[in-house]
Amino acid sequence: MAAPLALVLVVAVTVRAALFRSSLAEFISERVEVVSPLSSWKRVVEGLALLDLGVSPYSGAVFHETPLIIYLFHFLIDYAELVFMITDALTAIALYFAIQDFNKVVFKKQKLLLELDQYAPDVAELIRTPMEMRYIPLKVALYLLNPYTILSCVAKSTCAINNTLIAFFILTTIKGSVFLSAVFLALATYQSLYPVTLFAPGLLYLLQRQYIPVKVKSKAFWIFSWEYAMMYTGSLVVIVCLSFFLLSSWDFIPAVYGFILSVPDLTPNIGLFWYFFAEMFEHFSLFFVCVFQINVFFYTVPLAIKLKEHPIFFMFIQIAIISIFKSYPTVGDVALYMAFFPVWNHLYRFLRNIFVLTCIIIVCSLLFPVLWHLWIYAGSANSNFFYAITLTFNVGQILLISDYFYAFLRREYYLTHGLYLTAKDGTEAMLVLK
C-alpha cells in the first residue's frame, strides 16, 4: 500500500504547487468559504508585520491566531507554501496509519464476537471481511485530493494546521499512546478551543484499549481518567505558559479564545452565527451567543453514553459537530470529517438519503461563489440569499451526519437481534430510531 499512498502524495503536491503558481491563488485566498477571521493568511502576515515592528500582534483587532503559529511562521514565512503542503501530507499520512490500525482492532473484535456467538445467526452479509477493509486507509488518505482540502491549502488557511493536530491526536489515541494523545489533544485545543470535546471519545478509546470497564464504581476507571485528564491539562498549561513567555503578555487569551467564544467579527462565512448576530439587537447577543456555542458542547455527554462502546465513531460525529457549529467554520473543517466516510462504507446500505444530501452539499458548494458575486459585486441579491445557501449547506451536513448515526445504530441492532425482524403477529417489523 506504500506505492499507492506515495502516488496520492505526489499528485496532491503537484496539484497544490500548480495552483500556488497560478492566478487563482489570490482569488482563493480571499474566499469567505475557505478562510475566516481566525484562519486568514493575510491576518497572519499582518500579525507578523506588527511583531517585526516590536508591537504586540494582538494590539489591534485583526490577528486572532495563537502565539505558537505566529512564531512558527516568523521563521518559516519564506517557505509558507511548503509548510502548508507538508502539513496536509502529514494529516493524510496520520489518518492513513490511524485507520489502518483501527481496522485491525475492528477485525479482531469482530472475530472474537463471532467466536463467542454474540451475533445473530442471519447476519453473515453484515460481517466485514479483510478484503473489503483493505483499501479503506488509502481512501481516507484521499483527503489530500478533496477539493475542500486543496482550496484550504492554496489559501494558506491555518485550519490545515488544526486538522493536522487532530489527525495526530487520532493516530496516537488509536496507537494507545496515552501521553502523546493528551499532548496532541492539548495542542488542538490550544489552537482552536473546540477540540476539547474530543477528550471524551479519546478517553473512552484508551480505556477500551487498556481493558478498563467504563463503570462509575470501577476504581481503575477513575484512576485512569484522572491520569489522562492531568496529562491533558498539564500539557495545555505548559503550552499556554510557553505562549506567555514568548509574548510576555496574556493578550492572546482574549484575542484568540475570547474572539472564538464572543464572535465579535461578523464577516460572512459558511457558519450559522454571522447573519443571526448581524440582525440581532445588541442587548440580546450575549444570551444567544451562549445558546449557539452550547451546541458544540451539549451533545458530548449523550453521545458518550450512547456510543461508549464505539469511541472512534463518536469521535467522527464529534468532529462533524465541531465543523458545523463552531463560530468561524471553513471548508477545511468539513474536509476533515469527510475523510472518515470510507471508514463507514459498510453503513451505506442503511443510509436513507445519501444521494439527495450529497447533491445538496455539492450544489451549495457551487452556489456559494455565485450568490456571493450577486450580493457583493452585481448588487442584484442581498445577504439573505447568501445566508439561505449557507443554511441549506449546514442543514445538509446535519442531516447527513444524522443519517450516518442512524445507520450505525441500525447495523449494531441488526448484528445482535438479526437482520430480518418480525413483529408479534409474524409480519415484517420496521426498525425506528426514537
UniProtKB/Swiss-Prot annotation:
Pathway field: Glycolipid biosynthesis; glycosylphosphatidylinositol-anchor biosynthesis
Coiled-coil stretches: none
Keyword set includes Membrane: yes
Any one GO cellular component localisation term in the record: GPI-anchor transamidase complex
Segments traversing the membrane: 4-22, 79-99, 137-157, 158-177, 178-193, 194-204, 222-243, 286-305, 311-330, 331-344, 354-371, 384-405
Lumenal topological segments: 23-78, 244-285, 372-383
Pfam families: PIG-U
Alphabetical list of InterPro entries matching this protein: PIG-U
Cytoplasmic side: 1-3, 100-136, 205-221, 306-310, 345-353, 406-434
Subcellular compartments: Endoplasmic reticulum membrane
GO biological process: attachment of GPI anchor to protein; GPI anchor biosynthetic process
Binding site for a cardiolipin: 215, 308
Topology of the protein relative to the lipid bilayer: Multi-pass membrane protein
The entry's keywords: Endoplasmic reticulum, GPI-anchor biosynthesis, Membrane, Transmembrane, Transmembrane helix
Family statement drawn from the similarity comment of this UniProt entry: Belongs to the PIGU family.
Purpose: Component of the glycosylphosphatidylinositol-anchor (GPI-anchor) transamidase (GPI-T) complex that catalyzes the formation of the linkage between a proprotein and a GPI-anchor and participates in GPI anchored protein biosynthesis. Binds the lipid portion of GPI-anchor. May act as an organizer in the transmembrane layer to recruit other subunits, and thus is essential for assembly of the complex.
Quaternary structure and partners: Heteropentamer. Part of the GPI-anchor transamidase complex, consisting of PIGK, PIGT, PIGS, PIGU and GAA1.
Name of the protein in its database record: GPI-anchor transamidase component PIGU
Highest classification ranks of the organism: Eukaryota, Metazoa, Chordata, Craniata, Vertebrata
